[in-house]
Amino acid sequence: RNPNLWKTLEDVILPDLISKFGPRLKVWSAACSTGDEPYSLAMVLAKKVPMRDIKIIATDLDEQVLEKAKDGVYGENSIKGLPKEFQDKYFEKMGDRFYKISDDIKRCVEFKKSNLLKDPYPTGCHLIVCRNVLIYFTEEAKKDVYEKFNKSLVTDGCLFVGNTEQIIGYRAVSYTHLRAHETT
Protein backbone atom coordinates (compact mmCIF):
# COMPACT_ATOMS: atom_id res chain seq x y z
CA ARG A 1 0.00 0.00 0.00
CA ASN A 2 1.03 3.59 -0.62
CA PRO A 3 3.90 3.08 -3.09
CA ASN A 4 4.75 6.80 -2.93
CA LEU A 5 5.48 6.50 0.80
CA TRP A 6 7.69 3.44 0.25
CA LYS A 7 9.52 5.27 -2.54
CA THR A 8 10.20 8.18 -0.16
CA LEU A 9 11.40 5.72 2.47
CA GLU A 10 13.72 3.99 0.00
CA ASP A 11 15.04 7.06 -1.83
CA VAL A 12 15.12 9.74 0.89
CA ILE A 13 14.70 8.48 4.44
CA LEU A 14 16.87 5.34 4.44
CA PRO A 15 19.84 6.95 2.66
CA ASP A 16 19.65 9.83 5.15
CA LEU A 17 19.54 7.48 8.15
CA ILE A 18 22.36 5.31 6.77
CA SER A 19 24.54 8.37 6.15
CA LYS A 20 23.92 9.59 9.73
CA PHE A 21 24.08 6.30 11.62
CA GLY A 22 25.79 3.73 9.39
CA PRO A 23 24.42 0.48 7.94
CA ARG A 24 23.32 -1.15 11.22
CA LEU A 25 20.10 0.70 11.84
CA LYS A 26 17.87 -0.23 14.76
CA VAL A 27 14.43 -0.55 13.17
CA TRP A 28 11.13 -1.21 14.93
CA SER A 29 7.98 -2.20 13.06
CA ALA A 30 5.24 -1.50 15.63
CA ALA A 31 1.83 -3.17 15.25
CA CYS A 32 3.28 -5.32 12.46
CA SER A 33 0.26 -7.64 12.10
CA THR A 34 1.07 -10.59 9.79
CA GLY A 35 4.58 -9.35 8.99
CA ASP A 36 4.03 -7.90 5.51
CA GLU A 37 5.53 -4.57 6.53
CA PRO A 38 8.69 -5.68 8.37
CA TYR A 39 9.49 -8.19 5.63
CA SER A 40 8.97 -5.52 2.94
CA LEU A 41 11.17 -3.20 4.96
CA ALA A 42 13.90 -5.86 5.12
CA MET A 43 13.74 -6.24 1.33
CA VAL A 44 14.08 -2.49 0.82
CA LEU A 45 16.95 -2.30 3.32
CA ALA A 46 18.70 -5.21 1.56
CA LYS A 47 19.05 -2.94 -1.48
CA LYS A 48 20.97 -0.45 0.67
CA VAL A 49 23.02 -2.42 3.22
CA PRO A 50 24.41 -5.95 3.64
CA MET A 51 21.73 -8.36 4.83
CA ARG A 52 23.82 -9.30 7.87
CA ASP A 53 23.38 -5.69 9.10
CA ILE A 54 19.58 -5.78 8.97
CA LYS A 55 17.76 -6.41 12.25
CA ILE A 56 14.14 -5.38 12.53
CA ILE A 57 12.14 -5.74 15.73
CA ALA A 58 8.52 -6.40 14.79
CA THR A 59 5.82 -6.27 17.45
CA ASP A 60 2.11 -6.86 17.68
CA LEU A 61 -0.28 -7.68 20.52
CA ASP A 62 -2.01 -10.54 18.69
CA GLU A 63 -0.16 -13.84 19.12
CA GLN A 64 -2.03 -15.50 16.23
CA VAL A 65 -0.95 -12.90 13.68
CA LEU A 66 2.61 -13.08 15.03
CA GLU A 67 2.63 -16.85 14.42
CA LYS A 68 1.44 -16.24 10.85
CA ALA A 69 4.17 -13.63 10.45
CA LYS A 70 6.84 -16.04 11.71
CA ASP A 71 5.63 -18.68 9.24
CA GLY A 72 6.13 -16.21 6.39
CA VAL A 73 3.56 -17.80 4.09
CA TYR A 74 1.38 -15.44 2.06
CA GLY A 75 -1.36 -15.69 -0.53
CA GLU A 76 -0.77 -14.26 -3.98
CA ASN A 77 -2.95 -11.23 -3.15
CA SER A 78 -0.53 -10.30 -0.36
CA ILE A 79 2.53 -10.25 -2.60
CA LYS A 80 1.09 -8.93 -5.85
CA GLY A 81 1.76 -5.31 -4.81
CA LEU A 82 5.46 -5.99 -4.26
CA PRO A 83 7.98 -5.16 -6.98
CA LYS A 84 8.61 -8.12 -9.30
CA GLU A 85 12.28 -8.16 -8.28
CA PHE A 86 11.25 -8.82 -4.65
CA GLN A 87 8.74 -11.51 -5.65
CA ASP A 88 11.35 -13.33 -7.73
CA LYS A 89 14.23 -12.96 -5.29
CA TYR A 90 12.58 -13.48 -1.91
CA PHE A 91 9.58 -15.78 -2.40
CA GLU A 92 9.22 -19.48 -3.19
CA LYS A 93 5.94 -20.70 -4.65
CA MET A 94 4.09 -23.29 -2.55
CA GLY A 95 1.27 -24.98 -4.42
CA ASP A 96 -1.06 -22.92 -6.56
CA ARG A 97 -1.76 -19.83 -4.48
CA PHE A 98 0.80 -19.48 -1.69
CA TYR A 99 4.32 -18.12 -1.39
CA LYS A 100 6.91 -18.58 1.34
CA ILE A 101 9.33 -15.80 2.17
CA SER A 102 13.04 -16.63 2.01
CA ASP A 103 14.94 -17.61 5.13
CA ASP A 104 17.41 -14.78 4.42
CA ILE A 105 14.64 -12.21 4.86
CA LYS A 106 13.08 -14.09 7.79
CA ARG A 107 16.40 -13.93 9.66
CA CYS A 108 16.32 -10.12 9.43
CA VAL A 109 13.11 -9.85 11.48
CA GLU A 110 12.53 -10.72 15.13
CA PHE A 111 8.86 -10.95 16.12
CA LYS A 112 7.71 -10.20 19.68
CA LYS A 113 4.39 -9.76 21.43
CA SER A 114 3.89 -6.20 22.65
CA ASN A 115 1.00 -3.90 23.44
CA LEU A 116 1.59 -0.27 22.41
CA LEU A 117 -0.61 0.97 25.25
CA LYS A 118 0.93 -1.07 28.08
CA ASP A 119 4.36 -2.53 27.37
CA PRO A 120 7.81 -0.88 27.40
CA TYR A 121 9.11 0.37 24.06
CA PRO A 122 12.48 -0.46 22.51
CA THR A 123 15.00 2.36 22.88
CA GLY A 124 17.69 3.73 20.59
CA CYS A 125 15.64 3.26 17.42
CA HIS A 126 16.75 4.94 14.21
CA LEU A 127 13.48 4.17 12.42
CA ILE A 128 10.03 3.30 13.77
CA VAL A 129 7.40 2.16 11.28
CA CYS A 130 3.83 2.28 12.58
CA ARG A 131 1.23 2.54 9.87
CA ASN A 132 -2.53 2.31 9.77
CA VAL A 133 -3.10 1.34 13.40
CA LEU A 134 -3.17 4.57 15.39
CA ILE A 135 -6.24 5.72 13.46
CA TYR A 136 -8.15 3.32 15.73
CA PHE A 137 -6.84 4.88 18.97
CA THR A 138 -8.39 7.69 21.00
CA GLU A 139 -6.71 11.09 20.74
CA GLU A 140 -5.35 10.69 24.27
CA ALA A 141 -3.90 7.25 23.48
CA LYS A 142 -2.37 8.57 20.23
CA LYS A 143 -0.67 11.42 22.10
CA ASP A 144 0.74 8.95 24.63
CA VAL A 145 2.00 6.60 21.90
CA TYR A 146 3.59 9.43 19.89
CA GLU A 147 5.37 10.70 23.01
CA LYS A 148 6.67 7.18 23.74
CA PHE A 149 7.77 6.77 20.11
CA ASN A 150 9.66 10.05 20.42
CA LYS A 151 11.50 8.74 23.49
CA SER A 152 12.30 5.50 21.63
CA LEU A 153 13.93 7.33 18.73
CA VAL A 154 17.49 8.56 18.72
CA THR A 155 17.97 12.24 17.89
CA ASP A 156 17.38 12.63 14.12
CA GLY A 157 15.61 9.27 13.97
CA CYS A 158 12.44 8.83 11.91
CA LEU A 159 8.86 7.87 12.71
CA PHE A 160 7.23 6.54 9.52
CA VAL A 161 3.41 6.55 9.66
CA GLY A 162 0.64 5.96 7.16
CA ASN A 163 -0.73 8.75 5.03
CA THR A 164 -4.09 8.48 6.82
CA GLU A 165 -2.49 9.33 10.16
CA GLN A 166 -1.94 12.86 11.33
CA ILE A 167 0.23 13.71 14.28
CA ILE A 168 -1.58 16.66 15.81
CA GLY A 169 0.84 18.84 17.74
CA TYR A 170 3.86 17.03 16.29
CA ARG A 171 6.10 19.99 17.09
CA ALA A 172 5.22 19.63 20.78
CA VAL A 173 6.83 16.19 20.79
CA SER A 174 9.82 17.28 18.69
CA TYR A 175 8.81 15.77 15.35
CA THR A 176 9.64 17.44 12.06
CA HIS A 177 7.06 16.77 9.36
CA LEU A 178 8.25 15.27 6.07
CA ARG A 179 5.60 14.75 3.41
CA ALA A 180 5.92 12.12 0.70
CA HIS A 181 4.94 13.55 -2.65
CA GLU A 182 2.85 11.62 -5.12
CA THR A 183 4.93 10.49 -8.06
CA THR A 184 3.63 9.63 -11.49
Located regions from the model:
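Conserved AdoMet
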Residues: 1-28, 146, 162
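Hydrophobic/aromatic residues located in beta-strands of well-ordered beta-sheets
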Residues: 27, 54-56, 159
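Conserved S-adenosyl-L-methionine
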Residues: 31
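Conserved SAM-binding loop of SAM-dependent methyltransferases across substrates and taxa
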Residues: 36-48
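Extended basic-aromatic, gly/pro-enriched interface segments that bind polyanionic ligands
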Residues: 52-129, 133-141, 166-168
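A short glycine-rich, Lys/Arg-flanked "PGG" loop and its adjoining helix->strand segment in the class I
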Residues: 146-155
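Conserved beta-strand signature within the Rossmann-like core of class I S-adenosyl-L-methionine
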Residues: 156-163
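Conserved small/polar residues in nucleotide/adenosyl-binding loops
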Residues: 176-184
